[in-house]
């Protein structure tokens, strides 16, 4: 594990905020080149939606991943619930300029990111859960319902990848496992870390050793 690790989440298309944080912590220089050396940047999902600069942030992460590796460092981008939403065609939070672009091109917005595109291919290779050193990273959280599934981290990542480009109905039809992972008690949606324990049945620290890598 590297000496330093910067952990961010939910850029949501806000270039000004995201890029200023990277510069502030010397992850990139003024030309957006990797300057974080052998250290690690972990972004825990949700570049899609709300903001107007989704595409520039994705391309920056795409570029920095290689630059980080060349420098002996690492960039990790994990999937969040909004990656799963947009790629399934749930466009409730997409900024209007992107919807106008899709209309102009006469294709559904999510097709701009399908797995035949370079960024779509890249998104399809992202993990949902990742163990880095002693730290387990996931966008939302882990529920007792999740633990009952008895899935290893690689198995979870495989299931999430298989369902990433399917819509909600297709996920339900594909398998119960895919449907669960993209639903309320799955790793990108579970809210038990911040909401009622009576409803969300949180996982406690003593349960974590049961999560297999």
Predicted feature locations:
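Feature recognizes metal-dependent phosphohydrolase scaffolds
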Residues: 1-213
């Amino acid at each position: 594990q590297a000496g330093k690790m910067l952990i961010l989440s939910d850029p949501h298309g806000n270039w000004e905020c995201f890029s200023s944080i990277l510069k502030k912590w010397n992850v990139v220089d003024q030309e957006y080149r990797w300057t974080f050396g052998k250290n690690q940047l972990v972004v825990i999902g949700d570049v899609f939606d709300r903001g107007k600069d989704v595409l520039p942030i994705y391309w920056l992460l795409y570029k920095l991943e290689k630059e980080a590796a060349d420098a002996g460092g690492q960039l990790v981008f994990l999937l969040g619930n909004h990656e799963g939403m947009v790629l399934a065609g749930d466009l409730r939070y997409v900024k209007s300029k992107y919807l106008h672009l899709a209309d102009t091109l006469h294709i559904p917005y999510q097709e701009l990111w399908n797995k035949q595109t370079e960024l779509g291919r890249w998104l399809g290779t992202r993990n949902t859960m990742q163990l880095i050193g002693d730290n387990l990273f996931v966008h939302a959280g882990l529920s007792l319902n999740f633990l009952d599934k008895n899935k290893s981290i690689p198995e979870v990542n495989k299931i999430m990848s298989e369902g990433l480009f399917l819509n909600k109905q297709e996920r339900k039809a594909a398998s119960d496992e895919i449907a669960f992972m993209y639903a309320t008690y799955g790793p990108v949606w579970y809210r038990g870390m911040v909401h009622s324990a009576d409803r969300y049945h949180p996982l406690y620290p003593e349960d974590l050793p049961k999560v297999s890598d």
